[in-house]
Structures are given as structure tokens and as C-alpha cells.
Amino acid sequence: EVGCGRGGGASYIARYFKPKVFVGMDNAKAEIKFDKNYYHVKNLKFIYGDAMNIPFKENNFDILLNVESSHGYVHFEKFLKEVKRVLKPTGYFLFADFRNEKSIKTLINSLCMSGMKVIKKEDISRNVFHALNFDNERRIKLIYKYLPRFLHRWGRQFVGIRDSKLYNSFGNRKRKYFYFILQKD
């Protein structure tokens, strides 16, 4: 997984889907340090690395995962070239992320023109909006429990609490969330 962050998704996949090896990579050294200290799963390892220069040889992975990380990449097309380089022939790229209405077409075009075959593409914005709505109260409680008071407003915006800018942008379709499954030829 490129952009594994705090490692929760990587840990879940390693424990429940039991791949031979699962590698979580992130460009935040503090996150990788946390992941290495917190997760103790036999088939899971974490490394520091840059999505624009994935530190693995060509044709190395069966599957590469990228969830809610790429919206922060300055050179998305370079990242896609790296994905294609490190995937084995017939390997899969599983991708999910959001963009605002101005940049969603660029994202879709970049993925479709990546040189990998698009197996599936779906707009899941409505699902994300409904999930934010459904999980609203639990996330509010977490904000008030774990964040100092001066960060409450920021926390509400960051996690998309009802009526926040993030929440409303999914509701009014100014922000869209897509997932793709691509395959290297």
C-alpha cells in the first residue's frame, strides 16, 4: 500500500486476507515509526518511501493499493508510472480517492491513459456522503474525547462532520470520490 498512513488498512488486510507479505509505505517518517511499533503482524512490514520513486524493483508486486493518499501528490502521472513499473505483468492497481469538481476529469483521464487496463471505475460519492452522515455522532464524540478544545473546529472540518465544508462538498457533488481497478498488461 502506497500512502499507508497510520497503518490501519494495511493491518486489516494482512490479518484478514492473509497475503504472503503485505508492505505498507508512507513518506511520513513519524507514521512509519508508529506503524512499526504498534502493529505486530507476521506478514506485515512498513517502510519509508516516496510515491514518486517507489523503492522496489520492476515487476515486483501482484497488487498495489492506494487509498485517500494521491490527492496530495504533486506529480500524479509520475506516481502512475511508478505503479506500472513495480506491478508484475497482469498485476492489479486498486485505487480510491476524491477530487474537487475541477480536477476530477484530470484524475479520470490520467488513470484511463496510464497504460493500464481499466477493469472497473465507479463514482462512490453518494456512498461516502451517506457514510459520513451515518457515522456523524461517533466521530463527533471522538473529536471531543481526543482533541484539545482549540482543535475541535478543525477536527470537525477534517473528518467531514455534518454541515462541514467537506461533508457539504460531497452532498452538493462539488467533490467526487471514485474507485478504480486497473490491470497492467
Kindly label every feature range from the protein language model.
Residues 116-127:
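Conserved S-adenosyl-L-methionine
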Residues 3-7:
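Class I SAM-dependent methyltransferase "Motif I" SAM/SAH-binding loop
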Residues 126-132, 140-183:
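Conserved Class I S-adenosyl-L-methionine
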Residues 52-64:
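A short acidic, Gly/Pro-enriched loop at the edge of an enzyme's catalytic core
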Residues 8-53:
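Class I SAM-dependent methyltransferase SAM/SAH-binding core
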Residues 91-97:
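Conserved beta-strand signature within the Rossmann-like core of class I S-adenosyl-L-methionine
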Residues 63-74:
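A short SAM/SAH-binding and catalytic strip from SAM-dependent methyltransferases
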Residues 77-89:
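A short glycine-rich, Lys/Arg-flanked "PGG" loop and its adjoining helix->strand segment in the class I
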